[in-house]
């Protein structure tokens, strides 16, 4: 009997210790810490994080902790990253992937960032990993790139699944669709969170009629007005302000929303320009990385050599002339690319006006979301609220850098719901 009591006590003690212990997380491409905050709110401990951009690191340190390391992940060896990790999280950049005869092209140096996440997972062997990415990753190379990505994770021993989650269906006031890849070493079903909200049928982002989830117990999606309407008539301020008995930070916005802008006089096909520049880059023997370094645009110049509709771009006139100097290309597209004229903005077509009575459109790093009744961009704080950052989460850096940090983040609430499901699975299977 005494032995039975002793064993029972030991089981209870082990259970209490397990409850007190926090699962350990390593975060890659952490940015301002949206996904990290969600995991922390769910009871995890983020023991190490990394980002290359100084402003994002400053925001992270001042709000979450000093465990973030600023630097290029390719230059950080695995032995400098903590061991005994339960979960690795991050949104690896998807630029740099291409398909040639069903094999990866090594021409573009940006795909190394994907390999770095794979490296950390291979070396640390976390029980779970979470990778977030844009929907466009599914169609790269006709879908072959994404299948290769999943297969790489499977080769490490993980059961891998991927789903498109719309944040608005999880209590985020924003119709943000992202691919969430989950992997686990237990071989169990990956634990995606259940929907908590539904998007009414009068919204462009309709309820999925083929979903097996009933809407009876779901709440209506949170509208933009419900989330940020109380700030509509609050004057922009660089200083903290008190609104509804709480302190609001970063209620600052770009007011450079003019009726006219300088745009290209002639239509230019971005795909043709991309092929043209890649041909001359090859002739000149310049890598994308070398061009990045020449311009000082870390991970920016590469946009000129991509056809992705979401991330490919045509150089500005001043950049075009500089490219011409270093690559030595002919005059074929000079006129089309560099001739600018003043154009009128058609707000309903050229800028996204915030719709008040439904979840916001996707908050992005660069695309301006224009306030429904103010001639300005949504403020940094309004965007942060739509990303479900806490009111006390303060962003640092220039105005554009703050917008970038908010737009690149994973919504905190969505991350928390994902983390809670992973925690439950860890509790059962560890």
Stretches found by the model and what they are:
Residues 172-243:
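Flexible, glycine-/basic-rich loop-and-beta segments that form/coincide
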Residues 21-125, 135-147:
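Core alpha/beta nucleotide-donor-binding catalytic domains of modification enzymes
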Residues 112-184:
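Conserved Class I SAM-dependent methyltransferase catalytic core
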